Curated annotation (Swiss-Prot):
Residues the record lists as binding Mg(2+) 1: 631, 696
Residue ranges that the Swiss-Prot or TrEMBL entry lists as coiled coil: 39-115
Region ranges (Ty4 protease): 382-502
Keyword rRNA-binding attributed: no
Protein name per the record: Transposon Ty4-J Gag-Pol polyprotein
Keywords of the record: Aspartyl protease, ATP-binding, Coiled coil, Cytoplasm, DNA integration, DNA recombination, DNA-binding, DNA-directed DNA polymerase, Endonuclease, Hydrolase, Magnesium, Metal-binding, Multifunctional enzyme, Nuclease, Nucleotide-binding, Nucleotidyltransferase, Nucleus, Protease, RNA-binding, RNA-directed DNA polymerase, Transferase, Transposable element, Transposition, Viral release from host cell, Virion maturation, Zinc, Zinc-finger
Superkingdom of the organism of origin: Eukaryota
Ranges where the record places region Disordered: 1224-1250
Positions of the Integrase catalytic domain: 620-787
GO CC annotations, alphabetized: mitochondrion; nucleus
Role description: Capsid protein (CA) is the structural component of the virus-like particle (VLP), forming the shell that encapsulates the retrotransposons dimeric RNA genome. The aspartyl protease (PR) mediates the proteolytic cleavages of the Gag and Gag-Pol polyproteins after assembly of the VLP.
Organism whose genome encodes this protein: Saccharomyces cerevisiae (strain ATCC 204508 / S288c) (Baker's yeast)
Binding site residues for Mg(2+) 3: 1645, 1687, 1721
Amino acid sequence: MATPVRGETRNVIDDNISARIQSKVKTNDTVRQTPSSLRKVSIKDEQVRQYQRNLNRFKTILNGLKAEEEKLSEADDIQMLAEKLLKLGETIDKVENRIVDLVEKIQLLETNENNNILHEHIDATGTYYLFDTLTSTNKRFYPKDCVFDYRTNNVENIPILLNNFKKFIKKYQFDDVFENDIIEIDPRENEILCKIIKEGLGESLDIMNTNTTDIFRIIDGLKKQNIEVCMVEMSELEPGEKVLVDTTCRNSALLMNKLQKLVLMEKWIFSKCCQDCPNLKDYLQEAIMGTLHESLRNSVKQRLYNIPHDVGIDHEEFLINTVIETVIDLSPIADDQIENSCMYCKSVFHCSINCKKKPNRELGLTRPISQKPIIYKVHRDNNHLSPVQNEQKSWNKTQKRSNKVYNSKKLVIIDTGSGVNITNDKTLLHNYEDSNRSTRFFGIGKNSSVSVKGYGYIKIKNGHNNTDNKCLLTYYVPEEESTIISCYDLAKKTKMVLSRKYTRLGNKIIKIKTKIVNGVIHVKMNELIERPSDDSKINAIKPTSSPGFKLNKRSITLEDAHKRMGHTGIQQIENSIKHNHYEESLDLIKEPNEFWCQTCKISKATKRNHYTGSMNNHSTDHEPGSSWCMDIFGPVSSSNADTKRYMLIMVDNNTRYCMTSTHFNKNAETILAQVRKNIQYVETQFDRKVREINSDRGTEFTNDQIEEYFISKGIHHILTSTQDHAANGRAERYIRTIITDATTLLRQSNLRVKFWEYAVTSATNIRNYLEHKSTGKLPLKAISRQPVTVRLMSFLPFGEKGIIWNHNHKKLKPSGLPSIILCKDPNSYGYKFFIPSKNKIVTSDNYTIPNYTMDGRVRNTQNINKSHQFSSDNDDEEDQIETVTNLCEALENYEDDNKPITRLEDLFTEEELSQIDSNAKYPSPSNNLEGDLDYVFSDVEESGDYDVESELSTTNNSISTDKNKILSNKDFNSELASTEISISGIDKKGLINTSHIDEDKYDEKVHRIPSIIQEKLVGSKNTIKINDENKISDRIRSKNIGSILNTGLSRCVDITDESITNKDESMHNAKPELIQEQLKKTNHETSFPKEGSIGTNVKFRNTNNEISLKTGDTSLPIKTLESINNHHSNDYSTNKVEKFEKENHHPPPIEDIVDMSDQTDMESNCQDGNNLKELKVTDKNVPTDNGTNVSPRLEQNIEASGSPVQTVNKSAFLNKEFSSLNMKRKRKRHDKNNSLTSYELERDKKRSKKNRVKLIPDNMETVSAPKIRAIYYNEAISKNPDLKEKHEYKQAYHKELQNLKDMKVFDVDVKYSRSEIPDNLIVPTNTIFTKKRNGIYKARIVCRGDTQSPDTYSVITTESLNHNHIKIFLMIANNRNMFMKTLDINHAFLYAKLEEEIYIPHPHDRRCVVKLNKALYGLKQSPKEWNDHLRQYLNGIGLKDNSYTPGLYQTEDKNLMIAVYVDDCVIAASNEQRLDEFINKLKSNFELKITGTLIDDVLDTDILGMDLVYNKRLGTIDLTLKSFINRMDKKYNEELKKIRKSSIPHMSTYKIDPKKDVLQMSEEEFRQGVLKLQQLLGELNYVRHKCRYDIEFAVKKVARLVNYPHERVFYMIYKIIQYLVRYKDIGIHYDRDCNKDKKVIAITDASVGSEYDAQSRIGVILWYGMNIFNVYSNKSTNRCVSSTEAELHAIYEGYADSETLKVTLKELGEGDNNDIVMITDSKPAIQGLNRSYQQPKEKFTWIKTEIIKEKIKEKSIKLLKITGKGNIADLLTKPVSASDFKRFIQVLKNKITSQDILASTDY
C-alpha cells in the first residue's frame, strides 16, 4: 500500500504546484465572509470549482498520509518502520508547506480584493470595468458607449447637470443614488460615478473631494453651493424669490429657460428640505406662482382652473407653458412702448413700475442711491419729460389729490391681468340675458370664486361720432364692487392700449386720461362706456404740454453708449458725442483697457481677407516645381455617358506651369492615380521635387488614400479653411483661364462639347508656352532644369482643316485624308487629328495645313459655306455643297477610338438618313452656332446642345457664365456687323422695304425636318410654350415659334388673296413688290379677346391654315413671318424657352403658319396701345391637293390605361432639337428675271411634299380630388388664436413625439452637436398638422426628403401592389371559399430600420441632432425600406411573393394569403382559426387596426378606396365606388343641375377637333380652364380605373381634350358625372367559379381612323373563367391604314394582356395550362393570320402579326370569330345605342358571362 500512497503524494504535490500559478481568485468561504453591504469582484465558476477540488484533494491526501503513518507504527519491523516513517514525514511536510503557501496566497488575494480596486479589462468591444449593483452583479461599464455629454460652464446650470445625470444613471442602469434609502453602493460604482460627474462639472467648478467614496457628498455639495450662489436671499428657501414676471415680458425663450432652472432647483430643495409637504406638484405650483406679479397671477390661476392638464406632458412643463401663453396673450402694450429691461434691477421679465427694488415713494426717493443716472433724449419743445421726472410729477399730483374721494360707480377699472369683463351694474349691459348654468370665476376681484348671474354687451366709445362703437362680452357679477374691463379684450376689439406710464388709454382716434388709485388703473365711465339710453358724444381729450426744463451734464461709459446705440461702431459713437450732435451735455468715460464687446465679435465675425499678392510672396519662398495648388472643375453638363465630365488641374505656384487632365468621375481612386502620375512626371521630366500641395477640403482630396500617398512621399498637404475658396485662388483662376480658352476654341471651330477635353489639352499646352506676366518667363522653361527650345510654328490651330497622309491608301486612290486639327499628342511627336471619313481620332506627324494668311476662304467647318461674293458660278457652289455634305455624312457617325457613341445608322432607317442627307446639303450660315451641321452629326441625346458656355457651366464659383445668352456683347456686336441686311431695310412702320435689300447678298436656305424623324425624335409631345408677357419681343424672336415682333400687330399679311394663298402656285415665285403691296393692304389692327367665360367666342381655323381672331364683328386672318435679321435669330436661346416652359404650361393655342420659305421678318407697332397677349404658336400640317392630311403622327394619346393621366413633357427636347431647323431663308437669285435654277425648282418640288412639325399643348398631369389642408407648427400651435384647437394640436404633437420615442425611431438622450456631424447627413424635419374628416386632430413629424443629399440614400425604387393584383386576390380567395379580414398597420414606415447614417434635428434642442434609427416619413428610401422589411418578415414566416405580383404573398399550401399596399392589408385564410393565429402573429410585431371582419359571413368594408362587399356563403364579391361618387355629387351639385339625365355616359357623336378649332379667350381663362379640366378628368380617371368599366370609353374619349377647355368638353365631363351619380351602384361583380379548367378569354374590337387626328381606337375585355378581369379602351400606338390592320393591333394587345394574366395565375398556383381564347369580329384579320404567307405591311404591325401567327401554330391560343352585333367590345371603340350599353352592364354584373359570349362564336 506504500507505493500507491507515494504515487498519489507525488500527484498531489504536482497539483499543488499547478495550483500556485492559478489566477487571483477567492473561495466561496471568503466570499461569504464579505459584508453584504459591500460586494466583491465575482470569480468565474469553473475556476472556483477547480480550485475547490484541489483543496479537497489536498485535505484528503493529507488525512490519508496521517492514517498511513498510524498504521506503520503498529508494524513489527522497526527498521523498515523507521525508513517508511521518515519518507512519509517528508511527504507530509511538503504537502503542509504547499497548503500554507496556498493559504497565504488566498489571504493576499482577499486583501487586494478588499481594496475594491477598479480594474481595467479589454474584450472585443473595447475597454470596460466590472462592478456590482444592488440588482445585478458583474455589470460591465464601457466608457466609449456610456458617454455623459453634458458639460456645465457656470454654477446656475448645476440643476440641469444633476437632471441629466439622473437620466444618465437611469439609462445605463446604475444604482439610483438619488434615493434616500440607499446606504452603501459598490465602491467601484461610486468611483465611476464620481469620475463622470467630475467631468460634467469641469475644472472651473471642481468642488469634489477626490478621495470621497460616498456619492451623496457630491450631491449635497452641489446643492449647497448652488443654493448659496443662486439663491443668496433665500435663507428660508422661499420659492421664487429671485424672479419676478409680469405681462411686459416678451422674451419667451429666456423666460422658459429661467423657469425650467427654477423648477429643477425647487425639486432638489424639496427632496432635502421640504419633506413635510406631501405633494411635489403643489410645491412646484406655489414656487412658480411666487415668481408672478399680481397682474399676472390671477390670470394664470384662472387658466389652470379652466384648462385640463394634458396627461402627455409633465406637470411642471404644463405650468411653464401656461405662464408663457398667458404672458403673451395678456400684454396689451404695443412693442414700441415696452422697456428693454427694468431700470432698477435690469431684469427683462418685468417693467420698472412693478419692480420690488423700486424705491419707497414716501421717503421722497426717485431711484436707488446706488443707481447711476439714466439720461433720455429730450426734444427741444419740452413737451415730453424723462420717465423719472414724469413719474415724480405724476406722484406729486397724486399726493395733492390724496384727500379726494372717488366714486367707484363712476369709474371703470382697467385690468391688465384679466381676460374677461365683469360688472356689478346691469344697466350698462346691452342685450342682457340671465345665465342658465352655474358659472363661477376664480381670481377676479376676490380671493374666492364668484358666481355669474348673467351676461350682456358693453359698448365702448371709439370715436367722435360714436358710429364705430365696439361691443365687449361682459358678465354680470353682483358680488363685485365695480366694473372691470379686460385690457387685453379692449385692445383686441378697439385697438385701445395703455401708454408707457399708464397715464393714457386710447388709440389713434380717442385718448382717455387714467387715474391710478392704490395701484389700480381707473378711467371715467362716461368717457369709455356708452350706456344703453345715453346717445351723447364723447370728445377726445387733448394732451397738455409739459413745462420746459434744463438738462444737467451727464457722464456715460463707452459700454453703456455702445449698448444704447444698438452695438454700432465705437468710433462713430465717439465722434457723435465729441462733435455735440446730441442735445445733452455728455462726458464719455473710456475704459483703461481696449473696449471688447463679445456680442459684436460673435455677431459680426467675418472671414479673413486675402490681400493682393499674398500668394506671390509665398511662392517666391519655394523653388520651381516644389509648391503646387490643385482643384477640380466639373461636372460638365452633358447627357452622353461617354463624355468626360471633370477636369483636374495642378498649377506650380512659382513658375505657373499648369497640368490638366479630364476624367469621367472624381472618385478617390481616379484622382489619386492622376496626382501620382503628375508628381512622377514632374520629378522625372523636370528634375524637381514636389514638397507641398494646396487644395480645398473636397472629399476627393481629403480621403485616406491620398493622405497615405502624401505621407509616403513626404509631401505637405495644405488644406484651405472651410468654405474659403479664395485661399486656393490660383487654382480657381487657372480653371477659369483654361475653360474660357477651351470655350473659345470650341466656338471658333464649331465643334461639339464632346471635343472639350482636346480643347482643354490644347489650351493648357499653349498657356505653358506663353510668357507669364508675373514671372516674365515661359512656364515650361522656368520649371525645367534642362534647357528647352520652343518653336512657335510647331503649334497648329485648333479646329482647322488639314490633310494627313493615309498610310493604308490603295493604288490610284488619294493618299490624303481630310481631317480636323485637335491638339498635341503628349505620348508622341505628332498631333491628334479627327478624320471624319474614318470616324476616328488618330495621331500623325505627316500632315499639311493651308496657309490662312494667303486664302481666308478655306477656314474651318464654321466657314465652309462661302458667301455669294466668292462664288463665281453654280459649279463652285455645288462643289462646296458636296464638300460640306461629305463632311457632315462623316461626322454624323463619329466614334473615338476608346469611346463608342450612338450612330445614326442605329437610330434611323435608310430612308430617314436619305432625308438627312438632303438637308445636310444646305448647312447653316457661318454665324449660326446652332446650325444643321451640328444637328447632322450629333446623337439624339445631345441634339441642340450647342451653347458651349451653358454646357461647360457648373456650380463652381470660379466660372460664371450667362446661360441665357449665346453670344457675349462683343460677339453679338460682331454678329450684327456681319449681318448683310441693312437696318434701313425696315421702315418706320415696321414693314420690310424690299427696295433696300440686296437679294444677291441675302442668301439663306430653307430647312425642314424629315417627317419620319419627327415622329421618332419628338416622341409624343411636341409642345413649345412661350411665357413672360414683359418680354414679347424676345419671345417672338425665337426660332421655334416664328417671328411675330414687338408687342402688337398693327400690320398683318392678308393671305386671302389668291396670288399669295394659291396652293398650286409656289410662294417662292412671288415678287417682293407683290409682297409689299399685300402688306400695305392690311389695315386691320389686331386685338385679342378680353376676359370671358371658358369655352366662348371660339373661331375655327380654315383650310388655308389661317387664324381667325375675333375683333368686334370682323375676323382677321393672321400669317406670321420669319425674321431676316440674325440678331433676332441668335438672341433667343433654348435656355429661355425652357425657362418659359416651366413658368406656364397653358398658353392659348394660336397657330403660326410656316409653310412659305420666302417670308421675311416683320416688325409692327401697335397704334392703339393694345398689348399682344402671350401666344401659343403651332404649325399646321401642309394639306395635299385633295385636302387630306398626310402628316405623320405627332402626338401621343394622353390617356393612361392603368392609372390616372400623367405627362411626360418633351417640349424642351423639341425646342433644342429643331430650333435651327425651323429657320427659313431666302433662295439665291442668279438672273435678272428672278427665275429659279432647275436644281432649285426640283428641290422646291420635293420640299412641298414634306410635312412639318405640329406643335400642340402638351398634357398636364391630372390633379386628384382635393385633400385635407395641412398646416405647420406656427399656424397650429404658436400663432393659433383658438385655444381649444391649439390644445388638441398640442396633444396630437406630444402623442406623435411619444410614439416616435416608443418606436425607437431616435434616442433623445443621445444627441450630437451639429458641428460634429457633416451637413449632408442632416435632414431637416417638418411637423404636419391635419384635422381629419372625422374630427380627429393629427400630427405627423416628417423628414424633408426634398433636401436629402445623395449620400443619405442609395436605391429608392420599389415595387408595390396594383389594383389588378387586388382583383386577382379577391377572385382567388372567393374561388377557394376563404375567410377574409382587412386591417391597417399603424405607422408602418417606423418599423423599418435604416441602413444609411442619417441625423435629424433634436426635437427639444435645435442646436443638436439625433441619429435616425428607423425609416421616418418623408425620406426617399422609406417606402423601399418598409417593403423590404415586410417582405423579409413575411418570407421568414413562410409567405412568399413573386415578380409578377409584388405585395401579394401566400404560403406553399395556398391556405393563407395576404395582399399589402403600403399599410392597407387584406388577409384570406382557409379557416378562421388560422386567420386569427396569423393576425395575432402580426400583432406581436406590428400595431394593427382591424378595419373589416366577417359578420354573418359578410365582409362589408373598403379597400384601396373601393367599397368591398364579400358574401362568403353566397360566394359573391361586389366592388363599387358609392362613397367617392357621393362626394362628387355633393361637390358638383350646381353644375349637374344643368345637365340632362341620360342612361349612357358617352355622346352620340364627337365632332370637336382641337387641331382645327381655335379657342378665343384670354390666357388666364385658358389656364384656369385647363386646370379645371385636369381636376375633373383626374377624378374620372380614378373612378374608371378602380372598377367603373362602364365609363371607360367615355372618359378615354374626352381625356384627349384635356388641353381644350371648350364648353362642349365640360358638358361631356359633367354628363359622365351625372351618369355616375344616377347609377352609383354599378361596379364589378364576381361569382365563385369552382370550375378547374378555367380559361383566359379576351374579346377585342377596333375602329380605324375614328379619332380627330385619324388615329384608331381599340377595345379589349378580359375574363378569367366566368369573371371579368379588365376592360380598357385605348388609342392605337401606331397609325393604321385599314380596319384589318387596326383589328390585328387590337388582337395583339389583347393577347399580350392575356399572356401576362396567364403567367401571373401560374405563379399563384391557379393552373399550369390555362387556355387563352381570343375573340374578334374581323374575318379578314382571322384569314390573314391563318395564311402561310404574309403580305408586306408596316414594320411594327408585321412583327405583331408574326407573333400571333406563331402562337396559333403552337396552339397556345385559340382564335374565334363572333358576329359584329354580338361583339360586346364594340362599345369600347365607338358610341353605341342605349340597348347595347345595357347589355354591357349585364356583363359587368356577371349576368352575361364569358361562357355566354363563347356560345355566340364558332367555338
